[in-house]
């Protein structure tokens, strides 16, 4: 029993130990599992992070679009870092040391300043003489565009006598096969030599001129420039020729002019269409300059105000500018030619100006000239000048297309200064901050004073080929332009032959389709201008026709009116006391000056020709404007005869009298005595006997007719004043007067001439002497004083002075007979067969009576 108890105790102890062991094992397993889980999590996190980094690194590697494994990504990353390290080392070696330049200048600005100071440009040449790069500064020094030199041989720009020497210098390194080591390229390959280079010209026909230059540079292997820093340079080399090209070297040099330049010329434009505005006086002095001008020309506004614009122009451009300014003064606006403007930094820049004249808003007088100046490049100037000369200008794209040719392995068109600097183990790149420095860095064209360094060639050297058809087209275009300007009426059909002729012209060999289309566009523009001018001329013609129609309507209204004249009879002769002018049924008695225009029949048609034109004209007197002229005057009606005077048809007219006839009341100082008859063949008697200060002209004559004309408003266009000196008969220009001939008195010239011939010469001389002794101050003398004298005829006229040169007076007739012949009944019954119709005079133009101002 005791044993049983002890056994039970022992079994319980064993069971307790087994359970504790099992529990311990379970605890240990749980701990290991937890550690394993955490370790797996951390490992997975690390792997995920590593994969993310590898993926990000692979995405940054260039040139491969396919998915790469981790080892490839790591390998390419190592290669990239290695090349980057090499590039950094090269950049550090080529970096300009800080003690060479001021700290405030960048490498680009310092490089441009050095080029300006050296009067040079960069040039990269292959060993066979092919030019692969040239800087833009060559334009201001040698007047060549970079596109003219790239892909060309250097020997084309060197005199023939220097070809062998230059070729020997460039090919020297080829004799040493082991000299192309990096050490040799860095230290022992500097080369310097002098030669002559051809200077460019606008006209290829001009004689060639060479400038003496100095080359200073080094041979550089193209493999020394890393692919990552080529900046597109590698793309210009075709892949099939790249291995052979990479084994070659080039000569990168700074080309300097032997003769320094004092006045620079900036030929390139960094930003197109740079412009500024200014205002000038009519004497072309600066009145205003806007804020955009100082960065371009260097002058502040106060520095140029008051100075003449011609002080800043190149002497060779003054003549063309003067012509442009004359055109501006004639037409009020225009565009100047290309010209050079001197900046404050003593540099020439090319400008073109659009200008117009502004006028005062009140008095319409020109105030000043507004100018908009645009900066242009030398390439544009040269292209325009060559177009004027009829020379084909090669397009810039053609030079760039040459680099696409697969048959040439060394035609490389580099486009920036950075590439040449990289070949020279330099890597500066132009920055936006160096814009002002670039403008001041371009050097000028060689001064003509440096002629000792120039070698002119024989003028028999054949010039560059140009297109004669293009030149002819340009000349034809200019001739069409001159015809369109000078012609007064141009039809639209004029432009059709020109367009068809231009379309039928054969395209010469070498002329591109683009150039031919540009010429057709110019011809189309000329055609549009001609059509526009034609439309303007047609509009002017229509307007003039409308004005002519209105004038004809006024003439018809004037011809529809009548004129009635009342003659007052006196004892010794005829005293015309009043003149009544009627229009329809109304009689206007207001005193109004009458403007008329007419012509004088030549004296040789009536007389022998001994009387000059000046003697035929009646001296005019000034009619003073007084208040009495505004008052109305009644028309005197007495023993008068109403006469209707016939008209004259057109005849030969000479010696026009440019004045206006005004019939007024008699005055003491306005007497003109005109003889009623004059001898035709008498050369001894003087026509004008007296001419006193009271403006009286007295003609010696026997029988005279005293007339008194009173001013009355006339609605017609002309009044014919009696004048026995010229014709011998009163004539008017109204066709309606012919309807009153049944009641009118018509006198013939033949009767007057017969009466003059029948009169003895002695009696005529006595009458002339007696008329010279008579001094009658007015026609208001009593009739009793004239009983003992033969009847005299006086004509008193007053004419208004005014500035219309077209107004003329016809003095064509007089009244030679006495008062007994004037009654209409007596004339109609006894003298019907003696009436004679004289030609009708027609005046050139009529003055509107409404526009006549009282004097």
From Swiss-Prot:
Broad class of the protein's primary localization: nucleus
Record-annotated bHLH domain positions: 34-84
Enzyme Commission identifier(s): 2.3.1.48
Key words, A-Z: Activator, Acyltransferase, Biological rhythms, Cytoplasm, DNA damage, DNA-binding, Glycoprotein, Isopeptide bond, Nucleus, Phosphoprotein, Repeat, Transcription, Transcription regulation, Transferase, Ubl conjugation
UniProt modified residues of type Phosphothreonine: 451, 461
Subunit architecture: Component of the circadian clock oscillator which includes the CRY proteins, CLOCK or NPAS2, BMAL1 or BMAL2, CSNK1D and/or CSNK1E, TIMELESS and the PER proteins. Forms a heterodimer with BMAL1. The CLOCK-BMAL1 heterodimer is required for E-box-dependent transactivation, for CLOCK nuclear translocation and degradation, and for phosphorylation of both CLOCK and BMAL1. Interacts with NR3C1 in a ligand-dependent fashion. Interacts with ESR1 and estrogen stimulates this interaction. Interacts with the complex p35/CDK5. Interacts with RELA/p65. Interacts with KAT2B, CREBBP and EP300.
Protein's name in the database: Circadian locomoter output cycles protein kaput
């Amino acid at each position: 029993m005791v044993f049983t108890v002890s056994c039970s105790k022992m079994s319980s102890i064993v069971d307790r130990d087994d359970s504790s062991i099992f529990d311990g094992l379970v605890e240990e397993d749980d701990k290991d599992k937890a550690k394993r889980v955490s370790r797996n999590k951390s490992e997975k996190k690390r792997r995920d992070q590593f994969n993310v980094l590898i993926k990000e690194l692979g995405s940054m590697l260039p040139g491969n679009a396919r998915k790469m494994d981790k080892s490839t990504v790591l390998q390419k990353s190592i290669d990239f870092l290695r090349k980057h390290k090499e590039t950094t080392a090269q950049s550090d070696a080529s970096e300009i040391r800080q003690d060479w330049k001021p700290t405030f200048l960048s490498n680009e600005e310092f490089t441009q300043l050095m080029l300006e100071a050296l009067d040079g440009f960069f040039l990269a040449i292959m060993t066979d003489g092919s030019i692969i790069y040239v800087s833009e500064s060559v334009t201001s020094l040698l007047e060549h565009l970079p596109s003219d030199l790239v892909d060309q041989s250097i020997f084309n720009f060197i005199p023939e006598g220097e070809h062998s020497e230059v070729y020997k210098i460039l090919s020297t390194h080829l004799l040493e096969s082991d000299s192309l080591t990096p050490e040799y390229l860095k230290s022992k390959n500097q080369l310097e030599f002098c030669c002559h280079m051809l200077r460019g010209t606008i006209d290829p026909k001009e004689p060639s001129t060479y400038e003496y230059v100095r080359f200073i540079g080094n041979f550089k292997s193209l493999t020394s420039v890393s692919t990552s820093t080529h900046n597109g340079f590698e793309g210009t080399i075709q892949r099939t020729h790249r291995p052979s090209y990479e084994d070659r070297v080039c000569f990168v040099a700074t080309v300097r002019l032997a003769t320094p330049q004092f006045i620079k010329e900036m030929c390139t434009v960094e930003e197109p269409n740079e412009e500024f505005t200014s205002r000038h006086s009519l004497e072309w002095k600066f009145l205003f300059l806007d804020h955009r001008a100082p960065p371009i020309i260097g002058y502040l506004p106060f520095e140029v105000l008051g100075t003449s614009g011609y002080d800043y122009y190149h002497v060779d451009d003054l003549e063309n500018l003067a012509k442009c300014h004359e055109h501006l003064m004639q037409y009020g606006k225009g565009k100047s030619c290309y010209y050079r403007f001197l900046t404050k930094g003593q540099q020439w820049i090319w400008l073109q100006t659009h200008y117009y004249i502004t006028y005062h808003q009140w008095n319409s007088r020109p105030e000043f000239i507004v100018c908009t100046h645009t900066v242009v490049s030398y390439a544009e100037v040269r292209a325009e000048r060559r177009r004027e000369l009829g020379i084909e200008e090669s397009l810039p794209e053609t030079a760039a297309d040459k680099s696409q040719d697969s048959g040439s392995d060394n035609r490389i068109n580099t486009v920036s200064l950075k590439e040449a600097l990289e070949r020279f183990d330099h890597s500066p790149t132009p920055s936006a901050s160096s814009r002002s420095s670039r403008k001041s860095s371009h050097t000028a064209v060689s001064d003509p004073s440096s002629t000792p360094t120039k070698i002119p060639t024989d003028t028999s050297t054949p010039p560059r080929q140009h297109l004669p058809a293009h030149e002819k087209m340009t000349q034809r275009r200019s001739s069409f332009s001159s015809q369109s300007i000078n012609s007064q009426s141009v039809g639209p059909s004029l432009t059709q032959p020109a367009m068809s002729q231009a379309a039928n012209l054969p395209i010469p060999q070498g002329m591109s389709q683009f150039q031919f289309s540009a010429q057709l566009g110019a011809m189309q523009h000329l055609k549009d201008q001609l059509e526009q001018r034609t439309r303007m001329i047609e509009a002017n013609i229509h307007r003039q026709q409308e004005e002519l129609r209105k004038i004809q309507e006024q003439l018809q209204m004037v011809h529809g009116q009548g004129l009635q004249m009342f003659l007052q009879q006196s004892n010794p002769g005829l005293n015309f006391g009043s003149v009544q002018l009627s229009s329809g049924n109304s009689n206007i008695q207001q005193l109004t000056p009458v403007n008329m225009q007419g012509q004088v029949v030549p004296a040789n048609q009536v007389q022998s020709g001994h009387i000059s034109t000046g003697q035929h004209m009646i001296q005019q007197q000034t009619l003073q404007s007084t208040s009495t002229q505004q008052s109305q005057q009644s028309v005197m009606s007495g023993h008068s005869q109403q006469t209707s005077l016939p008209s004259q048809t057109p005849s030969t007219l000479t010696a026009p009298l440019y004045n206006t006839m005004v019939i007024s009341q008699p005055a003491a100082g306005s007497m003109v005595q005109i003889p009623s008859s004059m001898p035709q063949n008498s050369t001894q008697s003087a026509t004008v006997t007296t001419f006193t200060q009271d403006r009286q002209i007295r003609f010696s004559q026997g029988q005279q007719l005293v007339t008194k004309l009173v001013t009355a408003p006339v609605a017609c266009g002309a009044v014919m004043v009696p004048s026995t000196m010229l014709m011998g008969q009163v004539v008017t220009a109204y066709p309606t007067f012919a309807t009153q001939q049944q009641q009118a008195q018509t006198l013939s010239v033949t009767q007057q001439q017969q009466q003059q011939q029948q009169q003895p010469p002695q009696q005529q001389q006595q009458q002339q002497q007696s008329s010279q002794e008579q001094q009658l101050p007015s026609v208001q003398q009593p009739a009793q004083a004239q009983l003992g004298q033969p009847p005299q005829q006086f004509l008193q006229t007053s004419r208004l002075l005014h500035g219309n040169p077209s107004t003329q007076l016809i003095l064509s007739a007089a009244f030679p007979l006495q008062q007994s012949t004037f009654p209409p009944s007596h004339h109609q019954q006894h003298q019907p067969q003696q009436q004679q119709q004289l030609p009708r005079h027609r005046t050139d133009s009529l003055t509107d009576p409404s526009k006549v101002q009282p004097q």
